[in-house]
Amino acid sequence: MKKYLKTALALSACLFFVPAFAIEDNDSSASQNKNSHFLYGEVKEKEIYAFSNYAESIETAGASVDVITRKDIDRQGNPVISEILSETSSVFVQNSNGSLGSPSTLRMRGTDRVKLTVDGIRADRTSMTAPGVEPQFLLSDDIERIEVIRGPQGNVGGTNASGGLIALQTRRGKGPLSVEMSSEMGNLGTFKERFAVMGGDHSLDYYMGVTWFKTDGGMKTSDLGRIRNDDYNNLNIVANVGKRLLDDKADLRNIFRFSRARKDIGVGYMQKAPYGQYQSPNNYGLNFDIMDVLSFSHSATEKYNYDVKFGLYHNESNNYIRPDDISGDPVYESISKIASTRMNLMTQHNYKVADWNTLSVGYNFETEFIDGNTKDVGMWTGTVLNGYSGNTIQNDVYVNDSINIKDKLFIRGGARLSHNSDFGTYVTPNASAALVLPTFKLAGAKTKFRGSWGQSVNNPTLYQRFGTVNSSYMKSLANPDLNAEKMQSWDVGVTQSFFEDKLSLDFGYFNSRYKDYIGYEGYTDPATWVYIGKYVNVNRAKIQGYEGKITWEPKPWLKAIASYTFTDSEDTTTHHDLPGVPRNSIKGIVYWTPNEIINLFAGVEANSGRYMSTAVNSEKTKNYVDVKLGGKVRLVKTENAELCLKGTVYNLFNQDISMYKTATSTYYAPGIHFRTGLFWKYTIPEKKEKL
């Protein structure tokens, strides 16, 4: 494992200095699905890329999709991606204890089996305790756009995209050399500093940003009050360099990311009777992420284009429980270190068979590694050492056919054949369709009927298969015989737009069925009082519901979105709601830019209570409403520079927002808090040619 890790990190360091990939800049008309100029590799606001791995109009998508643009991200001003995603319809982010930086679970339409990619590469670590997404370490300043695709995406999206796909794209430079700087502060000991340089022309573009974000947390519990040791700080470094080649018909690009995040864990657990929680002064977690994406994309002819991509994602997750005088065992210490690596080599080739038919063929090679060890020291148990490692290899081939019938009926279908060294061979078909018609006798109005169906699989994480815990109070056993989860899902919906898309109403129904669902089973040994458990394929689950959304954008300076999602989820073994899933969720956000100087937004999120497990007597959190207000005001503007004042207020009404609950304690998110600061941008004047 160490040999593979050293090779991967060395390759990542080399790739950092090599330029990478561009997404095609297309006409947004429904009839044009081909790659076009690689000037900056941008995808337009009304286009989507991740659905077929090439840019196409959102109007043609047979699935339910949302696009969060750089403009939307900047308007919200939220530094953490998980908070931005929580404003999106049918997406729910559950923080494990309510404090920024704590482990988070992202669910879409009730399931946490969602795939997250950054620049096309999987961003979920193999050391997670369940397949899914942990977005708490991703900061938003370096993200250009976020694409949210609901429903099974196992064909083009690949493994672990059964519940949906969230695709993030890194910012790219354009225009003359520019410098951005911002400095912000707020209550709860919050500070945020950022510096970025960017620029680009038809030949070369570049972007590099450094962001440091820190907060004291603000979490509280019902039995301990405000948690004192709850700090979180995160350093992100991002570099994106692209070079056009072959008469601007090709693009070579490298995107590098580094993140170092520390989260203090202020809640400890007593090591002797009476067992319970206490204010821990020195426990913490430390997380490192390295990601590198190197790609080459080429429009060889008007009818054929392709891309080749290599991706590396390496994570080190460390947790430290340090000795103190409160726990009941003054020498008790537990140190856990897990290193995990994933490498991908992928390619997709798109053939324009006819003006109305685009055929895509792709291949993906993926290998994963995990290497973990723990050290547990106790007064009565002595020193207990534990180590584990494992790896898998997977090869995929897939085909996807996109048919356009007279710019009104759009049909997509295909399948992926996957072979995993541990889980065997399986096929995941997907199909979708969209029918777009002018509304009868109503100028500027369109009616869109959409539907999608698919099968997908979720591979167990390497931690679920190989990870072990061997401490004085708990033993978690490896289960190398775990099977992949299987899912089948379908949805239908209708979208009605008016006034040339200025007003849009969307309503849909979704239905999903899982089998071989992975759960955790265990028991307490009556002789030793040690809890013993492991991950097993025990459950089946079903999820169904409906979602509605209204989007109103009467003017470029005003945009409002409101959504409602009802989710009925059930563990068919216990006939109980799935954990962490709110039955009712209401969200709304308004962007208002009355002039060039002022930019304001307001957001609201209301969720019903959530069960913490599938047990009949499971604890349940309370309903909550969270309101946010923010904006940016331009103070000074010159020919080449601007200075702005920005600020945001969170949990405006100081609600007790319960994020997690046990039999003895309830964990609450921070009360009302704010952040404000200055943003400065300067563009280097271009030299004028002498006459």
Model-derived features: positions:
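Gram-negative outer-membrane beta-barrel transporters
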Residues: 404-411, 511-513, 530-614, 688
